[in-house]
Amino acid sequence: MARLAAFDMDGTLLMPDHHLGEKTLSTLARLRERDITLTFATGRHALEMQHILGALSLDAYLITGNGTRVHSLEGELLHRDDLPADVAELVLYQQWDTRASMHIFNDDGWFTGKENPALLQAFVYSGFRYQIIDVKKMPLGSVTKICFCGDHDDLTRLQIQLYEALGERAHLCFSATDCLEVLPVGCNKGAALTVLTQHLGLSLRDCMAFGDAMNDREMLGSVGSGFIMGNAMPQLRAELPHLPVIGHCRNQAVSHYLTHWLDYPHLPYSPE
């Protein structure tokens, strides 16, 4: 029996309308009744996730910013990882050949240089939103991550530019087909979950995890039981071909799987 369950949010626990379904909420409550520790492992900001947990009265650990922050049930900061100031400066000040929008994160929030209302659709559940700033005036010493949002082919070309400029000084990953992230070296959900399990006196073998994108790769590959969403990025399925694939987030597939796991643990599972 797993002792900790870690969940990605977008494309995994959240439905396509960016809400948590009632079946999902009910299943999370059942896990807590079984004394299974809940952990939300997401690229979203800690401020947003703390608001969501408060609104739902959920007790859960938080891995946010794709591993840049880990918080306890009480909101205590257990782990932090920031981009080196020189890396943040290069990414912010360089003229990149891209049409993608740039987004900067630190403990105070989400910042960008121009309005992009379409992006806010993903935050209707929480009301979290960006702040408009002069990117060149952004404090460089506290940047957790930098994201580029746009067309996937354009971002793939940008990834090459970033790698040529940064080399091994940053970790680049796609958190979605339309979002490329620049993170501190060694920073990912799997590394953050390792920190959390050590804090809790658990091993990664005691954990199950669910995800759909390349920013979930290390987490899914390191736990005792990793599960890939049916709507996952093809690259993730190719990287972890040995992991089982469950259903689509629109059908609350995580809840579907966990209900079976709780009720019929000795029977084989089918996502149908």
From Swiss-Prot:
Its EC number is 3.6.1.-. It catalyses: 4-amino-2-methyl-5-(diphosphooxymethyl)pyrimidine + H2O = 4-amino-2-methyl-5-(phosphooxymethyl)pyrimidine + phosphate + H(+). The active site is at residue 8. Belongs to the HAD-like hydrolase superfamily. Cof family. Gene3D superfamilies: 3.30.1240.10, HAD superfamily/HAD-like. Its cofactor is Mg(2+). This is HMP-PP phosphatase. PANTHER family: HMP-PP PHOSPHATASE (PTHR47267:SF2), PTHR47267. Keywords: Hydrolase, Magnesium, Metal-binding. Mg(2+) binds at residues 8, 10, 212. GO terms for molecular function: 4-amino-5-hydroxymethyl-2-methylpyrimidine diphosphatase activity; magnesium ion binding; phosphatase activity. Signal peptide: none annotated. It comes from the Bacteria. SUPFAM superfamilies: HAD-like. Catalyzes the hydrolysis of 4-amino-2-methyl-5-hydroxymethylpyrimidine pyrophosphate (HMP-PP) to 4-amino-2-methyl-5-hydroxymethylpyrimidine phosphate (HMP-P).
